[in-house]
Amino acid sequence: MRRASLLAILALVLAYASVAQGGGANQLAHFSLVRALTHGTAQVDSYHWETKDLSWYHRHYYSSKAPGLAFILVGPYYVLDRSGALGLLSRVTGATETAVALWILGLIGAVIPTGILLLLLRRVGDELEPGFGTITAVTAGAATLLFPFATLLFDHALSTALGFAAFVLVWRAADRLLPYALGGLVGGFAITSEYPLALVAGAVGLYAISKGAALRRGAAYAAGVVLGVLPLLVYDWLAFGSPLHLSYANAIVRQGVTGHDVLGANEKGLFGVSTPHRGTAEQLLFSRIGLVTVTPVVVAGAIGLFLLWRSGWRREAALAGGLCAAFVVYNAGYATPFGGGTPGPRFLIPMLPFVALGFATAYRAWPWATIGVAVPSAVIMLGVTATNPIRATTWHWVDRVTDGSFTGSGIWPKLPLAVFVVTSVVLCWRVTPIGRPRVRDAVAALLSLGAYLVIAFAGPRLVGTNPKLLAAIFVALLAGVSLWHIGLHRGGRSRAASG
């Protein structure tokens, strides 16, 4: 059983590694900083024409990205470049050196961190609901935005893994102070890798002191956080002359001829974050690429968090629910809430492992209803990943699947991706204690799938015109599915009592 469980996660990791997604401004902004650091500078003047995700300061270009991912990758890239391996692989594969480098660095900076995250989710899921850790991890890895972004050299995979690892360290710390300090260190480096992870680091800190001995544990955790953000402070000091000058400052809005015609991309509010808007929050959840629209399984996760609270894991459920709310509120106040070319609201990715904590209890309580929303989530995520997630800002990826073009090279290069995902699902099914479906199970799955289809159709049409009607439909559908399961549960207890 343990071997099949690990193989299920390994199959997903191989699925991530089987695709190379090419360039894009975000990936190339990270890559430009990696290359600059190998030459001992943070200035990306030599590469500024490759990307628009830049800042301009004292007549020089800088990547507007947090430097944590580049810190991890600078050593491997230096070896690849100086050894001539990049040139050799480029000649062998026929791809450009940049494409080869993005794929290899993506393995280190995105694929491996996501694999570690899934292992952590498996372990925590099994603690919360024995036997349901593997399906928790596989659902998170195949049916949420973690899937496409595990194949891209963005900072989300690394920072999200670090943020959740900080929680796991504190969660298992018991009476020892060292795990609290290590949790703080990991949480601090998550901030160094993606600034909004301060929300996760702060929330995990509150969770740490809620476990008792608040002063000692809080101090150990805080000391770790300081050490974790120290590389960021040193980088800012050396690059910009001040430890408090973040790369978000002086971000370029429009490049123009000079490359910095208009500055101030993040000047509104605090680095682009101002007063949250309810309409933006609705868009983040229910628009054409809203979180619920493209990955409806998160609704099952949210319900699972409520069930987790009721089962006695109250601190953990409160942490997860609070983080989800915090990220939606923060993102609803951000100037570019969807973050450009993306298959969904990518700035919400750091909260997804915490939503996934609810998958274990959801599968335990309502297995087939959860499967009913997990399947379309996985199909959509597989589709956008196979057709390049950066191009999935609309649902035109469906056309690229149906016409067989995918990313322009046809279906054959994408077959390993699909095979590995299917293999992972099959192995996961073998180790998960969910029996064969009965008639009522099939009805439950169809009810949840039908509810999703209604929301997927109505949501994008009502989100900007009649949000109250959308909310009423969503609540009614949720109540209907819930009442069905409550009725089944009571009916089962009545039959057991009469027997």
Please name every model-derived segment.
Residues 1-499:
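Membrane-proximal envelope and lipid/glycan-remodeling enzymes
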